[in-house]
Structures are given as C-alpha cells and as structure tokens.
C-alpha cells in the first residue's frame, strides 16, 4: 500500500473518551421515528411515505424497516467494482475545530515570516489554547485593557485553570510574546510610519496557499500524499519545530502545522516536500518566540562602498549596522529597535518586513475541500483496510465494538486539535458506471425466479425516482445525479457532513450490508436556524465560502446545535434498513465500520411548492440549479391528459403561481423599456449556457440578452445586472407567451376539475361543523364516486377512507356497547378485555363520536349509556365505602355491571370485596358447625384468605382461624401421639384428653379417633363386665371377638391380658384335643370329628326337598338348617347357652343316624343287586366291583383292596372302616375325660367343647344302652341267629389275595379290637365272581335296636370296651349246653320273660327318673299319665324283627320325649309349684361341678346324676340341655370314671 493512502491509527487513546473537547462527553440526541410497514403498506412506497410524512417531517429523518421477508439480492459485481476514496482528516471536518486550526495556521505563518521558531506553551500541564486566549482577551477589550484592569486571573478562570496559582501572570507572558505582536500587526500599528499597502491589490503571482485543499469538485488525485498519522497527545512537553535551511517557506509552514498537532497545510510543490518532525524536551522559559541565540543575523555586505545603500526605512539612519535587518521579500532595511514591537535579537531565518508581511497575510484562503486518495480500491481491499483500522484502533474485533463507543470517540476526535486521525470514504460512486446494489434488468447478475420480483419493486432505488408518482420522472434533461443511485463504501469514522439535498428534494438511503451507519437529522423547519447557529459559531468559515453548507465539508457537534435549541434526532441504520430524509432536512452522520450503502433522490407531488421555494432560495445564494423547475412544470402541463389527477391538480396550482410571477416580471421589464422579444427554445441549450449571469439560475420561461455580450443571459430578476447598455437595446427571450401558458393551465384544470369538485366536497364533508355534518352514508357515497370515476388512490381518498373506516368502527363499537353483552361474567386473568373500554375511554369515545366528521345514529344512545355507567360508578363507590358490605349487595351490583360492555375500574375492587365477603361468610358458616370444621377446611380457608387483598375484617378472621388451626393441629398431633403411644395410656388419661379436645370448636380426625377409641374402650369394658356379670359361660367366638376388639383399641385395658390368656388356654386346649383325636395329616377338622356327621349320603338333600313341601305348624319357628358342617358350626356359635347347643347337636345326631341308616341299606342293596347290573359304582374310584374287595363295617360300601389299605392276615380279623368312616384315632374315654375336665376349668364355651360334651354324653348314653343290652336276654337271641348261619356273605374271600393285597401292619380302617378267630369259618359263603376280604354282620341278621347300637358304636369317636364285648358276644360260638337249651321249648320262653323283665326293669327305672323330674318341675298328674300311656306301648315293641318296626319304635319314643320337652317349655316360672323358699334353697345349693359357673335367675336348672352318687348339678355347668335332661340319663364324670373299670 502506498504511503499516501496508508492509515495510521497511532497510539491508542485512553478510555473513557471524554476528551478535552469543549463539550466533554457526547450525549446522543433523541431517536428519530422508526416505521415497520406491513406488506400491504409496503406495496406502494409513495403512498407509505405520504402516510408517514406528517410524523417524519417533524424530525427530518426517519428509518423504515422492510418486512422481514423483503431481502433483495446484492447485485454488484464485488470483484470488478473499484473506486478511489476521499481522504478525511477528522479534526478538519468540525467547524469550530477548523476555525482554531486556521487561526493557529495564521499565527504559525506570521512567526514563520518573522524568521522565528514557534513553541506551543504548556500551563498547568495542559497545552495552552491560543485561540481561546486570543478570543477572551479580545472580548475583554484587548491587551491594554486587560492589563490595566488586571483581568488575567479572570481569563485564566474562564479557560478552566484553578485560581490562586499565579496562572494569570503566565498567561499574560505567553499572550504578550506570541499573540500581542500578531494583533499589533493586524491592527496596523507596525505600519504607522509607513504608507499602508493596498491589501486589495492583485497578488496572484505570489499567492500563498496554506491548506492546499481545493474544492471537492475540482480536486485531482495527487501522485503522493504525506502520510497521515494520529499525533500523540501532548502531555507535559511543548513541540519545538525547527526549520531546516534547505526547506522552502512552504515546507516549513507544513512542518509547523504537523508539529502543532494540526492538519498539515498543503503546498503546490508538495510532490518534492519532505517533513522533518522532532519533539524537543520541555523548556521552562516563559517566552514562546525564540530568536536565534547564535551569531546575530545581519545583512552581509557585498561591497564596502555599498554600505550606505542600506538605511532603516523607519528612522532613515544607517547606524547600528549589526541591528539592521534586510527583508527577504522586498530588500527594505529596518532596525530591530525601530519595529513595533521592537525585536530583541536578529531572527535566524528568513524575515519579512511589515509591508511584505501584510501583503502575505492578506491573501484570501481557498475553499476547504476533500482530496482524493492516491490508491484505487476494490471492495475486498477496502474492506480489509477498514476492518484492520477499526480492529487496531479499538484493540478488539470489529463486531464487538459498541456503537455508543464509536459515536463518542468520533465526536471527541473531530473536536480536538491534538490528535490527527485520517480515514477514507468511498463516497459518490456512480451506479451508472459500476452497477447498482439492487438488481436491474439486463444486469450481469442472474436472478432466481423468487428474486425477479425485486426488479420492479418500488423500493428498488433504481425505480423510485422514475415512478409515476415521482415528479422527477417528468424531467427529460440529464439529471442523472438525482435520478440515478449513488454508492457509498464506508469505514469506521468516515463521515458525511451537514447538508441538504439538491432542490430540497427527498432522499432515501438503503444499507445493503455491513456495519451500521449513524445518522443525525434536523427537521426542515429548523434549517435556517441551523445555518444561523453555524454562521454564529464559525463566522470565519463563511467569509470565504458563503455556501459552505452546500459543499458537504463541514460538520458540527449535535450537542452544540442542541445547546442552541436546534432540534436534532439520530438513528443507527442497520443492514437492510432504509433512511428517508425529508425536504430541506439537514442531515449528517458517520459510519460505524465497513459497509455498503446506496442512495437516490426523489420528489413527490407535495414537494412542488417547496421546489419553487428552493429555486428562489438558490437565486438569493447565487447557487446553480440542477434543473429548471419551470421547465419541469411546463413539461408536465404539456401532457396533462395522461397526468394523475392529483398531480394535475397540484401542477395546475403551481403553474398558476408561475404564470402570475412571469406576468409580473414581464410587465416590469416592459416598463424598463425592453420592447424587443424573441421566442427561444431554452431546453435545447445546455444548462451552463442558459444560466443567469448574476444568480446562476437556469432560465427557461424567459431571459434578457444584449448584443454587446452575446451568449450571456440574465433572468428577469436581474435585468440591470446584464450590462451598462440602455434597456431598449435588450432583447426579451421567452419560451412561451402568456397566451400559450393559459391553455396549458386550463388543460390541467379540466383534467383536475372533476377531481377538484370531488375533493372540494370531500374537504367540506371532512371539515364540516357540528350542525352541518353529513351522515356516514354520504361519506360512503363519496368513496363510491371516486371508485366509479377512477380517481387516483391519493392521500385525500385514503384519508376519506380512513375516516369512513374509523366511523364504521366507531359505529360497530358503539353498537356493541349498546348491546351490553359480555361473553363471560368473569374473565380469566382479571385483565382488561381488548374489546372493552374503560369509563374514561367510553367518555373519550363519546367525545370522539361527537368529533367525527360524520354523524352516527348511535351517538345519543351511547351518551345515555355513559350516563348510566356514571350512575353505576356512584352507587358502587357508595357501597365500597361501607366497612362490611354484604356479598348479596355486591353481587347485585356486579350483575348490574354486566349490562355494560365497559371496563369499569370499580369492578376489580368490587370483586375483591365480594371474594372477601364470601370468604367471611364461609368462615362464619364453617364456625357455626364445629363438628364439620376439619383441619383441611381451616387450611383451605386460610389459603383462600391469604390470597385475598388485605382488609381488616379478613385479617381478624384470619387471625382467629389461624389460632384455631394452631390449637387444633396441636391437639390433633397430641391425640395422634396418644393413640400411637407405647405403652398405651390408661382410659382415664385419654378421657381427660378427649374432654380437652371436645372443647375445641373443630373436627380433629385424630381427636375423633381418640374419642372413638375411648368410647370403644368403654363399650369393651362394659361388654366384658356384662359377660362376667351374666353368669353364663362365655363363648369362644365372643372372647376372640373381645380380644380382637381390645387389641385394636389403642387404650390400656386391664382385662385384655386376662382374656388373651383365656383365649390362649382355649387354643392350647384345642391343640391338645386335635392331638388326641385327629390322625396325622387328617383331612378333617376337630369340630368335624367331634360333631355328628352331616355329609352322609343323599338323605340331607331329600329331607330338604321334603321339608320345603311340608308347611310349618302354626306357632313354631323354623328349625335351623343343618345340612353341612358350616351350618352346624354356625348354629353352635349362635347358641346362647349350652342347652341350645346340645339340642342342636342332638338334632344333628338324629340326622346322622337316619342318613347313615339309609346309606347302609342302599349300599347293602347295591351289593345284593343282580350281577348283570353294570351300573354299580363302588369304592373311592367309583368304578365297577372287582375282586378282591373289602366291605366297610359302617357304611357297608365295598372297596377295592388296591384302592384302600386293608389289614394283613397276621393282624387277625378286625373291624374295617373305610377312609370316609374312620375320621379319628378314637381315643379311649380315659384320654377324653381330662379334656372335658380342663375345658370345664377354662369356663369358655366353644363349638368344639360343646361337641366334646355331647360326644361324651352320647358315648356314656351308648355305654348305658350297650350294658343294658348285654345284660338282657335279647342279645342271646341275636347270637343264635348269627350262629345258625343267618348271617351270610355274598362274596367269598380268597385268603391268598387278601394276604397279598395289603401288607400294612395296621391299616387306618381297622379297629383296635379283634374278632373271634372262627368268624370266617362260621360264615356261609356263596359262590360269586366277586369276593371281599372281610364280611360284615348283615343288617337283616340283627334287630333294629342292635343294628342301631352297632352302627352308633362305629360313629362314636371313642374306643369303648363295650364295643368289643358286643361284637365278641354277637360273634362268639354257642356252647353245646346253650345249643341244648336253645332246642328246649320252655327255655326260650323263660329266657324271653327274663329278658323282658330286665328290659321292663330298665324301663321302670327310666320311668321313675322321668316321673321324679316331672314332679320336681310341677308337672300335672294328667300330663304324667299321658306320658306314661305313650311310653307303655314300648313293651309291645321289644321284639323288633324288621327295620320298619324299629322305625315305629323310634317314632313313638321321640313322641314321648317331645311331650316331655313340651311340658318343660310350657312350665313357666309363674306356673311352678315350688315355693319361694324352695326356689331360694335351690339357688343357694352348691353345685359339685369342678368349674361351677354360679348361674343366677332363669339359668338355675338342675340335673341329677343317674350314677352311683345321685348328686345334683347345674345343667349349664355340666353342659346338659333341658331336652337332654328329660330324654336321657345323666351320669357325671366322676361316676363315669369310677364305674369304667367295673364295666370292663
């Protein structure tokens, strides 16, 4: 990169960047408006700009963000685009800074011409601002006045120095030595003895150019430029600039500027210029201008005789030759002490006399402008340079530098003279030459189908200036500078200065890509204000450049403008955003970094009046016009038939003004004497050939020319400025006559007339007063007329549509408000509905309705609604002012509010108060019923209360509720701990806690559980006491239920351990009973073994069916169903006393006996059936009979020896029972009686105990009957029949098969006693293919009584000696004597009588016992006789030879027992014959039972032992029911045990 274009950021400045500038840290101006149009709005750019114009005009600039999907492709060829940027030194841009630099340049030039070296002094470690010092001294009256009045301290204070440090004297010395000689020179005091030179003489041949920055428009790129750099901040040293001898004056001036940290002035011979910069250390001397200390410079004498030629021009003397100075400009001589002010020493450099110095310093400076860089860039190379510069300057990546930091640093740099930062700006690159960034037709960039839409987009800057709505489209002259876009490639700090667009037109700028561009804008109405402020603050700049602000070379800090009340706005334009500037809106800005932008001018119809005003302004400034405004108007008027009616109307108005002005000017010219005229086609001339010589205005309508100056023209405003010839020699050149202009204007008028009439009607309708307003229908008619006549969619029509739409919306809203319907009573979230108005908005809406340009029918109705809403507000306010309003009243008022579709401010508070009132009522209601007030209810109420707005009543209720909850939770937790306490608490302590809990007005779950536990404990104790006090033996289930209940009660119960022990004893007793009775792995339960069988045969089912058919006798309760063990167990459990249990078991015994008898007969019959009956099913397997088989002694069914276990031959013959019939071990009675005794000691009733008692009673009863049978003669008769071969077996056994079938030592089915050895030998066998290993006593071989006795013997689960004795007696062989006796005819009769007598004795004994009982119970003699009569026929039934006879006998016996039971049932205590004394004796008698229950009252029933002791026992103590006591003999346990050995 060449040195001329290299950018040197220099040392990094310290941050924050407040800088030493006059304004301190930069404060950003307010933001300008930012618009984000919808797609519909974005479709027409001119319509959108017209829409936003009222807003954006107030700020001068605005930003437009296109819709997000609008992203035009970048159409520039990046590789082929190249440009030469402009060089910008930032501190030369700012107006006030440039004034300072110019002043310092003049001071430097003055001292340079005086041959002295200039040092910039430092005061208080700060560089002295010579410009400010000079200005302040001048404001105070000058050097002499300040010294006289001693104002140096005041001046030092104004310059920012601290007072009291003798700074004033230092400043005075610096001023006196540096500035005072210069001011004396300017005032002319140094030339008072000389004739002042004419400063206005032409000195072009010696012209001095201190800046060498020609105007921007005429600068040519130089081959080389001095390297730009950032000067270091001057800290504590002054800069001493030495001028080398070989350097020219211009070079020294250049170096002087560089040493002062100022922009370097350029010289004409800059190509060979070299700069030498040196910083010298601080010198403590106060003086600033230092003369040469070496050999004083004097005029060297060329010849000895020429000395007299040099004399002082002031004093005329040639003396003091060594003090005589020779001017290097004019060779005049002066004494150093004759000069004003005098010089102490001879300068070391070239010296100019006051005359030459005045001539040099009076030369005007050339206009300031930008110079072009020497290097040509492409986008790529410029971007690399720009990014490197910004990254190095801020020492961070470019994208991380905040825009605020860049902005503050920019304004600091442009305001300081100490730092020289130079940047480059690729500005004003013609898109015509390099292509636009937007796609264009026939462009080099190929577009996708989606991107082709951008070719015709109105926002494509190539299209916007030439669109139909743009006025510039009608200009045929070549104004490509305004109609074609310009490209701008920026870098960090590159800027564009304050300016307005040509002809005060609009401009639009689009940032294609890159970093943001910061804009500042001033609205058009403040343009002259900005100009005046800048002229006031920097008047020196406008002396040489009156049109400075049109040159785009001057910038001023926005804060400075805002301080002088100039409105300034800013924005950051990001990539993809537009910035629009409005007519006459000054704007400036800078780039944040490398970016690419494109801009173009355009003019809308509303600009036309401003455009004419701008031309007049240009005429005053003598500024060139880009095009002729009048020519444009006439061009548009010439094609009035195709103009838009709005454009035609506007052009017609502007043309009328033009014609009037032209008519007046031509009349003025005519009065001056100009009479010659000629038509001239001005549009055919180049613009520079038809410009007014005076004001530079482009002439079109007319001009004045003179033959003395051919080719020169003046406008009619400056006729007198053409030449000195008399006016009659002038010639008026015109384009149109007035007669030509009027038809053109009328054509425009005709084109716009219908529209104007319509527009007039629209304006009248829009601006009508209240009493003259039209209806909404009239507005719609105007819109329909515009559509029918195809008027343009201009601002007026859009405004009419907008007003109509607003009116329609207002009508719709008004109707909705009048309907007064809300969708919901309460909206979620509590927020304001978007469709609802507040009362204030309603009031404003009503006001808006009255302010509408049209009249709505809903307006008066809505006014009435507003009145009703205001009444509601008054009532609601009154209700809300009450301390405790009722919920009902609040709800009623809220219901009224639902009629209004208005957001009422009171509703929120009313709903809050309603919630509070409802909550308070809910709390009050909950507290009225403490039993239903749970902890969760209290917590819920508290949670609801917490969510309520603060209110005193709520807070009080909350406090009470919280206190109640705290107490309740405390006691509930305490109750819970009491319930879970181990060991458990006593009933008294828990009852005390319950009393405390009952005082709490709330429902406590654990408290309720504690209360329930206490109540359950009391009930339990009451039940236990009742059980103990009743005198009854407790039932096991009752005890278990009590124990279970007691264990579940969390209270310490004293009786519970005793009951648990009792239940444990019962369980132990049951375990002992199980071990005694049940076999190993028995499928039967203990109760099932002890109770009579309920699962025998099918008799149960038959009896059930028969009972269903038999009606119950009147007055009798239905008997308990005993068809299964569960029925029997339930009946035993439900029985309240032992007697009823025994009766139940007795009934079960009868069922068992009957069912088994039927089963035995059926099985016997099955075995006696014909052989060909193949349906016979036997055995456990229920298959057909097959030898070998064995027959069960009890059920008489046959079983295959392969299916069951049978005894071996070695074991002898034993009674065999099948698995169904053998249910227990059948322990001997001696093992059972201790169980009964221990059960009586336990004194607990349980089904198994009742069953055991009944089984023992049944066993003892069977023993008694068996003993009677054995002692009677009836058994002999049976024995004879058995022995005589009446007993037979159908099947014959095979000994070998039996022995091989079973080898078990003791099969489960065998009994514990043996049969006679000759049992099989005495049996007659029939030949049959079936045979059994054992034969049973045939049923028809014995009497029914014996058969029943034998059957019941096997049913008994007890081993008795009488059973074996009975079988041995029946199956023993008769002796010969017995056989002889049996053959005797008399013996049998005798034996029979004996037998009958024995039997009769037994019966008499029973009758005596029965009679004794009946007498004791007071039975009448008649009833006893009836009983005796019923029992007497038994004598006839002694001989029982058939089962039918046996059944008749049983029925008769049961009838007698039933009579006894009936007599017992009907003998109530009131009918008894006992006296009260006897009753008391019975009650006081002692029961000898081991575990006497000591019953009282109705339970004192007695039974006498029929054994040897004859003692009386309580029936309930020995487990005997009244029925059993009447039907059977009772032998106590002691007699049973005592008599058992004798019976053996």
UniProtKB/Swiss-Prot annotation:
CDD domains: ARID_KDM5B (cd16874), PHD1_KDM5B (cd15603), PHD2_KDM5B (cd15607), PHD3_KDM5B (cd15687)
Recorded catalytic activity of this chain's protein: N(6),N(6),N(6)-trimethyl-L-lysyl(4)-[histone H3] + 3 2-oxoglutarate + 3 O2 = L-lysyl(4)-[histone H3] + 3 formaldehyde + 3 succinate + 3 CO2
GO BP: branching involved in mammary gland duct morphogenesis; cellular response to fibroblast growth factor stimulus; cellular response to leukemia inhibitory factor; chromatin remodeling; lens fiber cell differentiation; mammary duct terminal end bud growth; negative regulation of DNA-templated transcription; positive regulation of gene expression
Gene Ontology CC annotations of this record: chromatin; cytosol; nucleoplasm; nucleus
Effect seen on changing residue 499 to Y: Abolishes lysine-specific histone demethylase activity
InterPro entries linked: ARID_dom, ARID_dom_sf, JmjC_dom, JmjN, KDM5_C-hel, KDM5B_ARID, KDM5B_PHD1, KDM5B_PHD3
Compartments (UniProt record): Nucleus
Cross-link (Glycyl lysine isopeptide (Lys-Gly) (interchain with G-Cter in SUMO2)): 148, 204, 209, 242, 274, 278, 769, 1450
Protein's name in the database: Lysine-specific demethylase 5B
Provenance organism: Homo sapiens
Gene: KDM5B
């Amino acid at each position: 990169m060449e040195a001329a274009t290299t950018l040197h950021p220099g040392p990094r400045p310290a941050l924050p960047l407040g800088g030493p500038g006059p304004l301190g840290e930069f404060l950003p101006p307010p933001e300008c408006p930012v618009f984000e149009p919808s797609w519909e709005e974005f479709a027409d750019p001119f319509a959108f700009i017209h829409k936003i114009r009222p807003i954006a005009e107030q700020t001068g600039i605005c930003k437009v963000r296109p819709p997000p999907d609008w992203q035009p492709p970048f159409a520039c060829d990046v590789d082929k685009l190249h440009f030469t940027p402009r060089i910008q030194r930032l501190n030369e841009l700012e107006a006030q800074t440039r004034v300072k630099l110019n002043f310092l340049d003049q001071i430097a030039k003055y001292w340079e011409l005086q041959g002295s070296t200039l040092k910039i002094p430092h005061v208080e470690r700060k560089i002295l601002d010579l410009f400010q010092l000079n200005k302040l001294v001048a404001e105070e009256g000058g050097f002499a006045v300040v010294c006289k009045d001693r104002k140096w301290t005041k001046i030092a204070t104004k310059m920012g120095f601290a007072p009291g440090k003798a700074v004033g004297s230092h400043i005075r010395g610096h001023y006196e030595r540096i500035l005072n000689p210069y001011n004396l020179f300017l005032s002319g005091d140094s030339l008072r003895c000389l004739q002042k030179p004419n400063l206005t003489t032409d000195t072009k041949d010696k012209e001095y150019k201190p800046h060498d920055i020609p105007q921007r428009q005429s600068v040519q790129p130089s081959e080389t430029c001095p390297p730009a750099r950032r000067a270091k901040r001057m800290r504590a040293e002054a800069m001493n600039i030495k001028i080398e001898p070989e350097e020219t004056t211009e070079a020294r001036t250049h170096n002087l500027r560089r040493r002062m940290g100022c922009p370097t002035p350029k010289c004409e011979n800059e190509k060979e210029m070299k700069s030498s910069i040196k910083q010298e250390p601080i010198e403590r001397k106060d003086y600033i201008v230092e003369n040469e200390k070496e050999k004083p410079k004097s005029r060297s004498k060329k010849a000895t005789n020429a000395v007299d030629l040099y004399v002082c021009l002031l004093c005329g003397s040639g003396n003091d030759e060594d003090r005589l100075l020779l001017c290097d400009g004019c060779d005049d001589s002066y004494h150093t002490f004759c000069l004003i002010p005098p010089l102490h020493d001879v300068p070391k450099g070239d010296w100019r006399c006051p005359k030459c110095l005045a001539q040099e310093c009076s030369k005007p400076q050339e206009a300031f402008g930008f110079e072009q860089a020497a290097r040509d860039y492409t986008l790529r190379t410029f971007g690399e340079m720009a990014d490197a510069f910004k990254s190095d300057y801020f020492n961070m990546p470019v994208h991380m530098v905040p825009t605020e930091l860049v902005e503050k640093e920019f304004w600091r740099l442009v305001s300081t003279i100490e730092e020289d930062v130079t940047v480059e700006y690729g500005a004003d690159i013609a898109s015509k030459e390099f292509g636009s960034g937007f796609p264009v037709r026939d462009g080099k960039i190929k577009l996708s189908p989606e991107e082709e839409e951008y070719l015709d987009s109105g926002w494509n800057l190539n299209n916007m200036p030439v669109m139909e709505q743009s006025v510039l489209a009608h200009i045929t002259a070549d104004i490509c500078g305004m109609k074609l876009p310009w490209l701008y490639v920026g870098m960090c700090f590159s800027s564009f200065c304050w300016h307005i667009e040509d002809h005060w037109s609009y401009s639009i700028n689009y940032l294609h890509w890159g970093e943001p561009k910061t804009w500042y804008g001033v609205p058009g109405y403040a343009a002259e204000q900005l100009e005046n402020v800048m002229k006031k603050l920097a008047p020196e700049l406008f002396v040489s450049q009156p049109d400075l602000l049109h040159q785009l070379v001057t910038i001023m800090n926005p804060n400075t403008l805002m301080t002088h009340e100039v409105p300034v706005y800013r924005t950051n334009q990001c990539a993809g955003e537009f910035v629009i500037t409005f007519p006459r809106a000054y704007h400036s800005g800078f780039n944040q970094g490398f970016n690419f932008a494109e801009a173009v001018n355009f003019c809308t119809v509303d600009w036309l009046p401003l455009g004419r005003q701008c031309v007049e302004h240009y005429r005053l400034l003598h500024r060139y016009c880009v095009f002729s405004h009048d020519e444009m108007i006439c061009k548009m008027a010439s094609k009035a038939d195709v103009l838009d009616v709005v454009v035609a109307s506007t052009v017609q108005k502007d043309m009328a003004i033009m014609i009037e002005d032209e008519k007046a000017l031509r009349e003025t010219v005519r009065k001056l004497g100009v009479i010659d005229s000629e038509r001239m086609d001005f549009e055919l001339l180049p613009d520079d050939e038809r410009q007014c010589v005076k004001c530079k205005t482009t002439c079109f309508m007319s001009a004045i020319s003179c033959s003395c100056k051919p080719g020169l023209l003046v406008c009619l405003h400056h006729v007198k400025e053409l030449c000195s010839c008399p006016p009659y020699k002038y010639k008026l050149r015109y384009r149109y006559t007035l007669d030509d202009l009027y038809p053109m204007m009328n054509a425009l008028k005709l084109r716009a007339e219908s529209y104007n009439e319509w527009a007039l009607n629209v304006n009248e309708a829009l601006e009508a007063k209240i009493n003259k307003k039209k209806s909404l229908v009239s507005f719609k008619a105007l819109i329909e007329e515009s559509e029918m006549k195809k008027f343009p969619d201009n601002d007026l029509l859009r405004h009419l549509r907008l007003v109509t739409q607003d009116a329609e919306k207002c009508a719709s809203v008004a109707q909705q408000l009048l309907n007064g319907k809300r969708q919901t009573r309460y909206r979620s979230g509590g927020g304001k509905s978007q469709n609802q108005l507040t009362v204030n908005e309603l009031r404003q809406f009503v006001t808006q309705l009255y302010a509408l340009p049209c009249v709505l029918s809903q307006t008066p109705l809505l006014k009435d609604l507003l009145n009703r809403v205001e009444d509601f507000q008054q009532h609601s306010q009154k209700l809300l002012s009450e301390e405790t309003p009722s919920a009902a009243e609040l709800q009623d008022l809220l219901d009224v509010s639902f009629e209004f579709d208005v957001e009422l401010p009171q509703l929120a508070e009313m709903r809050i108060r309603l919630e509070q009132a409802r909550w308070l009522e809910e709390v009050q209601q909950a507290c009225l019923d403490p039993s239903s007030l749970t902890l969760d209810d209290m917590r819920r109420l508290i949670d609801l209360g917490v969510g309520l707005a603060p209110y005193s009543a709520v807070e009080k209720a909350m406090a009470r509720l919280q206190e109640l909850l705290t107490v309740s939770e405390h006691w509930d937790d305490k109750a819970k701990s009491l319930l879970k306490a181990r060991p458990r608490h006593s009933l008294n302590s828990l009852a005390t806690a319950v009393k405390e809990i009952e005082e709490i007005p709330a429902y406590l779950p654990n408290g309720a559980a504690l209360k329930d536990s206490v109540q359950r404990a009391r009930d339990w104790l009451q039940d236990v006491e009742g059980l103990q006090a009743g005198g009854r033996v407790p039932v096991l289930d009752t005890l278990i239920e009590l124990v279970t209940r007691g264990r579940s009660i969390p209270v310490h119960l004293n009786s519970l351990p005793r009951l648990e022990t009792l239940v444990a004893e019962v369980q132990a007793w049951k375990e002992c009973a199980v071990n005694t009775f049940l076999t190993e792995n028995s499928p039967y339960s203990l109760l099932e073994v002890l109770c009579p069988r309920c699962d025998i045969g099918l008799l149960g089912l038959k009896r059930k069916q028969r009972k269903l058919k038999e009606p119950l006798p009147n007055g009798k309760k239905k008997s308990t169903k005993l068809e299964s063990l569960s029925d029997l167990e339930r009946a035993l459990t439900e029985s309240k006393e032992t007697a009823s249990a025994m009766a139940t078991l007795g009934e079960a015994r009868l069922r068992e006996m009957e069912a088994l008898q039927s089963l035995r007969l059926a099985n016997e019959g099955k075995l006696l059936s014909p052989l060909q009956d193949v349906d016979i099913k036997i055995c456990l397997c229920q298959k057909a009979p097959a030898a070998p088989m064995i027959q069960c002694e009890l059920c008489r069914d046959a079983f295959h020896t392969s299916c069951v276990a049978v005894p071996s031959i070695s074991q002898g013959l034993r009674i065999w029972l099948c698995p169904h019939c053998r249910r227990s071990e059948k322990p001997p009675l001696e093992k059972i009686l201790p169980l009964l005794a221990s059960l009586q000691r336990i004194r607990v009733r349980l089904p198994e105990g009742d069953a055991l008692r009944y089984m023992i009673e049944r066993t003892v009863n069977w023993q008694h009957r068996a003993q009677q049978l054995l002692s009677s003669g009836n058994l002999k008769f049976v024995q004879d029949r058995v022995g005589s071969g009446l007993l037979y077996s159908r099947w014959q056994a095979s000994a070998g098969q039996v022995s091989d079938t079973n080898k078990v030592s003791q099969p489960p089915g065998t009994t514990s006693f043996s049969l006679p050895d000759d049992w099989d030998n005495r049996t007659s066998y029939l030949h049959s293919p079936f045979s059994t290993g054992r034969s049973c006593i045939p049923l028809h071989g014995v009497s029914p009584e014996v058969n029943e006795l034998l059957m019941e013997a096997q049913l008994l689960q007890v081993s008795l000696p009488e059973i074996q004795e009975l079988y041995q007696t029946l199956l023993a062989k008769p002796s010969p004597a017995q056989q002889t006796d049996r053959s005797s005819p008399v013996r049998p009769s005798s034996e029979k009588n004996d037998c009958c007598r024995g039997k009769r004795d037994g019966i008499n004994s029973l009758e005596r016992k029965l009679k004794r009982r009946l007498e004791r119970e007071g039975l009448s003699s008649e009833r006893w006789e009836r009983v005796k009569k019923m029992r007497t026929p038994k004598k006839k039934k002694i001989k029982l030879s058939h089962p039918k006879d046996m059944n008749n006998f049983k029925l008769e016996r049961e009838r007698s027992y039933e009579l006894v039971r009936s007599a017992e049932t009907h003998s109530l205590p009131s009918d008894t014959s006992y006296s009260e004394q006897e009753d008391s004796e019975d009650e006081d008698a002692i029961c000898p039972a081991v575990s006497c229950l000591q019953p009282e009252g109705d339970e004192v029933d007695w039974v006498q032992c029929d054994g040897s002791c004859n003692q009386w026992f309580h029936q309930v103590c020995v487990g005997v029911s009244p029925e059993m006591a009447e039907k059977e003999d009772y032998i106590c346990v002691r007699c049973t045990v005592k008599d058992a050995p004798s019976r053996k």
